[in-house]
């Protein structure tokens, strides 16, 4: 039955706190020192995150009465869907069913803590080409704990701790699937701003549905899932030395930073099997609740007209906490130089080695492998929703290497008059490692059995990537306050190899790269007023790997507007329009066609108004 109506309802809060102390010490006119220490900690997440799903149908006897007789969609351009024009009215007439198998709750709560200390020392020189030297050390100790949980309601008379079989969705209430007109908004949602179109778009009235659950089942309960947590502890020790030099026309610096990272990543990885769903009758078909043989199973619940098996007979789940310790050290040299060829011409150069550690989620998100039997899939089809038979799953990659790159820049700038500059820059970045998402069928051995896990989602490292290109930029400001800024970047990347578990599994351009990117800003400014219009265009952006094909974000452009007015020297009014062009972002799979649509996203046209008071 289509369409399935679904959505989410969330109540959450977060608290972030920071405490810092900095001490600056002028040891002498030529020696300076600074010491900084602090702690930052935060916690937060939903107290409720609830999903409800429904279908436009109602069971009458042994048959279903459908509330929608037509479904069609078109994925060209802005995706659109078309349904029976009277779909909303049919829902109001009570032709609807709560899909209890797709009605659930899952929330995440996170705690983050970090302690840090940094010491910096500067030695100044009064004469000679050496301007100063700087050296110092920094220590960071960060911890992240994330756990998930559920908000649920249990049937009257059931143990509130019985999450598996006591929830109303588990079938202990045979009327749980009966949808009332009040569960839906009285009118279809009409203010669809972008991203997709639909001739009719019914919505779920979450406050009304949750109020119904509270009145029917006596209030909600929360539980924490011990089999869905992750922990990361990351200690970073670093020290640096830098020498700054200056002559009449040449200035710059050369230095090195040594960084040692100690990292512990732990997650709960689970294996869950969905073996069956409904009790079978003598012929092997799902047993109807009205079947005389059903009387022999008085504790079994009724769902969609059939007897649903208890959790322990239908599913099984095991999990284990898996942690990995890693330690690595990086030596990161850097060099910067600027040469004033003339009073208006400057040549700049830079070379450095940089790293970026993998994101916490990439190395510690809980893993999950799920098996769906043919019996389970067939039963779920009867109930109105089905997965694909076989193994599926996802998991983090605790062996991810940090992003590493050696980068070079060379630029020439011409300051041809006050308030005006034109420049050209060349760049090259040799990327040793980068992280990208991968979705692929993966052979695994699970409990001694060789299986094929379909569409396994994880993270992998890209190796030996190259990004090189040219940047053109300029700015010109007229005497009366009008000005323009422009920037264009051309970026050429190679096909980097993708490595997972030590094996090359494919190739991909450098993730996050776009061949072309341009920005143009027009502005006017005087003592009282500032107006700015910025147009940004980014070419096709490379994403991760999905079943051997690269994910691409199509070219995107956006216009932003900003104004500010100084009422007095102390008061300023501001206003902004973000995405004035109502641009949408479209993602597709593969370079041979744009027809494999993954998503089309509209972030909205956003308006901001503000006032600033300086005192």
Give the location of each predicted region.
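Gram-negative outer-membrane beta-barrel transporters
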Residues: 426-431, 435-546, 581, 610
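Transmembrane beta-strands of outer-membrane beta-barrel proteins
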Residues: 29, 33-35, 131-137, 250-256, ...
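Outer-membrane beta-barrel transmembrane strands
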Residues: 2-50, 92-151, 217-251, 257, ...
């Amino acid at each position: 039955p289509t369409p399935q109506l679904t959505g989410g309802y969330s109540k959450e809060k977060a608290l972030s706190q920071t405490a810092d102390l900095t001490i600056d010490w002028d040891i002498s006119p030529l020696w300076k020192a600074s010491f900084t220490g602090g702690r930052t900690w935060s916690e937060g997440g939903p107290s409720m995150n609830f999903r409800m799903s429904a279908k436009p149908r109602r069971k009458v006897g042994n048959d279903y009465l459908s509330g929608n007789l037509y479904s069609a969609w078109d994925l060209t351009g802005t995706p659109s869907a078309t349904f029976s024009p009277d779909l909303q009215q049919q829902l109001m007439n009570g032709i609807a069913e709560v899909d209890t198998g797709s009605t659930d709750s899952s929330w995440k709560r996170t705690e983050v803590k970090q302690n840090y200390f940094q010491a910096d020392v500067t030695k100044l020189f009064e004469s000679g080409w050496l301007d100063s030297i700087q050296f110092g050390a920094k220590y960071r100790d960060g911890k992240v704990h994330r756990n998930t949980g559920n908000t649920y309601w249990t049937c009257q008379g059931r143990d509130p701790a019985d999450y598996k079989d006591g929830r109303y969705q588990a079938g202990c209430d045979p009327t749980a699937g009966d949808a009332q007109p009040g569960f839906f908004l009285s009118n279809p949602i009409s203010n669809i701003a972008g991203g997709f179109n639909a001739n009719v778009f019914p919505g779920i009235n979450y406050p009304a549905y949750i109020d119904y659950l509270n009145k029917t089942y006596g209030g909600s309960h929360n539980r924490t899932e011990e089999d869905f947590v992750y922990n990361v502890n990351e200690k970073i020790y670093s020290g640096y030395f830098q020498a700054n030099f200056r002559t009449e026309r040449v200035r710059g610096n050369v230095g090195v930073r040594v960084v040692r990272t100690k990292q512990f990543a732990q997650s709960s990885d689970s294996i869950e099997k969905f073996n069956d769903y409904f009790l079978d009758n003598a012929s092997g078909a799902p047993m109807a609740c009205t079947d005389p043989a059903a009387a022999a199973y008085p504790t079994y619940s009724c769902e969609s007209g059939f007897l649903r098996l208890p959790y322990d007979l239908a599913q099984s789940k095991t999990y284990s906490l898996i942690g990995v310790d890693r330690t690595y050290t990086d030596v990161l040299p850097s060099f910067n130089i600027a040469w004033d060829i003339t009073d208006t011409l400057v040549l700049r150069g830079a070379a450095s080695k940089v790293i970026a550690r993998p994101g916490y989620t990439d190395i510690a998100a809980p893993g999950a492998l799920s098996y769906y039997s043919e019996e389970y899939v067939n039963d779920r089809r009867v109930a109105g929703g089905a997965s694909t038979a076989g193994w599926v799953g996802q998991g983090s990659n605790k062996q991810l290497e940090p992003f590493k790159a050696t980068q070079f820049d060379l630029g020439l700038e011409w300051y041809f008059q006050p308030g005006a500059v034109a420049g050209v820059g060349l760049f090259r970045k040799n990327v040793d490692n980068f992280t990208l998402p991968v979705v692929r069928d993966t052979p695994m051995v699970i409990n001694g059995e060789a299986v094929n896990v379909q569409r396994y989602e994880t993270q992998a490292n890209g190796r030996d990537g190259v990004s090189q290109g040219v940047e053109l930029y300029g700015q010109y400001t007229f005497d009366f306050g009008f000005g323009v800024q422009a920037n264009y970047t051309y970026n050429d990347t190679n096909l980097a190899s993708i490595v997972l578990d030590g094996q090359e599994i494919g190739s991909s351009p450098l993730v996050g790269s776009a061949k072309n990117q341009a920005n143009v800003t027009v502005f006017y400014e005087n003592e009282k007023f500032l107006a700015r219009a910025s147009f940004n265009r980014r070419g096709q952006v490379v994403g991760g790997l999905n079943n051997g094909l690269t994910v691409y974000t199509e070219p995107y452009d956006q216009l932003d507007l900003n104004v500010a007015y100084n009422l007095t020297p102390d008061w300023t009014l501001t206003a902004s329009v973000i995405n004035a062009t109502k641009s949408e972002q479209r993602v597709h799979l593969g370079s041979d066609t744009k027809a494999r649509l993954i998503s089309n996203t509209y972030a909205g046209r956003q308006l901001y108004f503000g006032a600033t008071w300086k005192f």
